[in-house]
Amino acid sequence: ANFILERHIAGVGCLHKHAVVDTPYGICFADHRQVSLIRGTELSELSLLIRDTYQGLDLEVNRGALALGYHPLINNLVVNYSYDAVVMYAYNFDTQSWAKFTSFNNSGKFQSQFEISDDQELQSFSTRTNKVESLFRSNSNDSASVLLLKTKRYDFGLPEKFKRFTKLH
């Protein structure tokens, strides 16, 4: 495959091959300083809102820690920056807000880029079990799941008006 460099943006880059993911909103990528989104020629920093909590990303790339994944069912960008996967961040594209999660599946040690399973769940390779495992179940009531978020979009007619009613469980 031949690649052509389209443009160079000074001070912004992709740190690792697992630090980039394609989303319906554009391409998301991460480096030591930030998580960014590029849409065509427009570049925006997504991580600006959570800088106060992490003071710059502390990425452990040599240990296979950094990974970005997009979860299509709940419209979230998941950022794993810790080798032990004790803390992850999720960016919700609908609300344009960040959430901090701890102890996904109580497993820890997830690495590699996330994959989408047949039932549209976000998965990653666990070094603890040496298997590909789901990080969380967005469509279950499993009490062991960390992220128990269900959404459903309702249409109330009037197609010319934008409206959304979301129910959280």
Please provide the spans of the model-predicted regions.
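Beta-sheet repeat architectures centered on beta-propellers
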Residues: 11-26, 31-169
